[in-house]
Amino acid sequence: MSQAIVVAALYKFVTLEDYIELREPLLQAMLDNNVKGTLLLAHEGINGTVSATREGIDGLLAWLRNDPRLVDVDHKESYCDEQPFYRTKVKLKKEIVTLGVPGVDPNQAVGTYVEPKDWNALISDPEVLLIDTRNDYEVAIGTFKGAIDPKTETFREFPEYIKANFDPSKHKKVAMFCTGGIRCEKASSYMLGEGFDAVYHLKGGILKYFEEVPQEESLWDGDCFVFDNRVTVRHDLSEGEYDQCHACRHPINAQERASEHYSPGVSCPHCWDTLSEKTRRSAIDRQKQIELAKARNLPHPIGYNYKAEA
């Protein structure tokens, strides 16, 4: 790869009794390796996306895998020319991906992992119910052909959607997917708890599918939303054509950028009529700072913070 920056999405469900104590040394390991991005720590494990040079990512992964609990931490890689994150952060959370249902624990029960090479055959089975576990704005960018869109705004809405629409006695085979594998893994644990028997999820998520399945064999339609400044990636993991509205976080395409309601860093057609005046003024000020820093060839104005956050 010619690109200078490696982007690594990583996670693992594993009991971390000392996750609070891990926060500071993990942050220091990121700083020592010049890694940017955000990692989440919780009792149930670790999750996040980070970026650095090849050497920096390898250094952080080596540090993580020095802990026997994280020796097999799952990670997917893609590449870009510029640093896609501004900050280096470690946050403490109740959940590394928030479902909001007590007792759901992938460390205790989880669905059947499906390797990317076997995914096409599974979802081509007419008896399989294929569910996209991501949020509505992510699904709008791209999804697998034939997948059901729950139209959820957050993952917290997923349990109610399942209860309202599906029955374990009628839906015998369920396959789920998400960006990097973590959300659908937790969703599979929830589904098993609700009585669904045959529950499958894409190992490594969409990003691993892009890595391993040739584009000519792909059943994916569109781009994949990613949680960094690239906004989306194509099947070949190159950066897509979408931008992101900094006010509402919604992805926006070229047509939406041409709208009279689009103002870079301030508003877009999805949010222009819902923003409060206070939010709009704050966004305008923020954008001015960004443009001024860029014109003076200075670091991004929100890029100075190194944080270990509770």
UniProtKB/Swiss-Prot annotation:
Residues 124-218 form the Rhodanese domain. It catalyses: uridine(34) in tRNA + AH2 + O2 = 5-hydroxyuridine(34) in tRNA + A + H2O. It is an enzyme of class 1 (oxidoreductase). Its EC number is 1.14.-.-. The active site is at C178. Catalyzes oxygen-dependent 5-hydroxyuridine (ho5U) modification at position 34 in tRNAs. PANTHER family: RHODANESE-LIKE DOMAIN-CONTAINING PROTEIN 7-RELATED, THIOSULFATE SULFURTRANSFERASE/RHODANESE-LIKE DOMAIN-CONTAINING PROTEIN 2. This is tRNA uridine(34) hydroxylase. It comes from Pseudomonas putida (strain GB-1). The gene is trhO.
